């Protein structure tokens, strides 16, 4: 591995040479493990609350703080990848994430668990360092394929996290899930340290100047603002659903355990499978049409969940599964299209553009988790469905609103 541990230049001498498959697999797996850490708790909320002696509303703050920490970490930590060796940042974050997960598994109280959840969210942003690292390492001729593979790993991490955590919590307890996750991240961190090259900093801007440039990009590019706002609104409904699903299934009329809640994560396969398909449509027809179709799918799916409450229990459950497949497909397709829009705005600021998009996305998720737990506590499941449907309608309205097209930002980026 010594031949790939040298400081890496973003402009490789052999633009058609392929990145070694084991390294691509390592990056993809590590991104999946990192992002999975912020979703493990969602199917386990029912057993976590019972095990630690916390109310549904209190334990519902676990995913809220995790998502908030993730958004905060993207905003405050992700820009450092342009200033310092990205390999060192990734490995340090992996160590911090492993420790935060271990602390969560050993938390003696709900207060300690909430602190651990915030730390997990902050450190899990190493996934957002791995994706631009993959783009930098990949030769231009294969960059799209490499980044697509890493994004597939990230999406599968989201998918499998809920399935695995629901199963482990049901059979070994929720604390075991956090400890196993800690060990997996630690192993990935060692592999990344040994397998990745060092990266040359691409700027000498101070930390304050890096953060300040985010505001400049936000003010300058209307397409960035629209993409971020629409994805944030869509994420409100996405997170409101996933952060309350386990509690809803745990109660009447279903009385199901963590395994059932985690199994709903299999519906996320639709999102992972939709990623390359959505990308192809965005390339041929423009990302704009993908964003509109994706948000429309989410609206239809969430509205159908409300109608499903009128059906018998078994039919209700089947309709809920089908609607989960549809809305997850819509959300993930819209995200891929928004990334296509954002990455095409300014090639020299893609990392910071990506940070802004994902800050908005995970701010929406944190808001959705908070509002979802309040809606469930005060209005029941139907209130959660109304919240998710309304936020998705808001996302569609943002995408339908005509956009200004400044000279530095061709309107063609969003046509279709």
Model-identified regions with their sequence ranges:
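C-terminal transmembrane helical hairpin of 12-TM major facilitator-type secondary transporters
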Residues: 289-334
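Intracellular juxtamembrane helix-capping segments at the cytosolic ends
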Residues: 126-138, 333-346
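Conserved MFS/SLC helix-loop-helix module at the cytosolic interface between two early adjacent transmembrane helices
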Residues: 72-110
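Juxtamembrane intracellular "pre-TM" segments in multi-pass secondary transporters
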Residues: 9-18, 196-229
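Helix-to-loop junctions at the C-terminal end of transmembrane segments
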Residues: 74-85, 274-287, 376
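Cytoplasmic helix-loop-helix junction between adjacent transmembrane helices
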Residues: 116-154
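Helix-loop-helix hairpin linking two adjacent transmembrane segments in secondary transporters
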Residues: 112, 142, 149-196
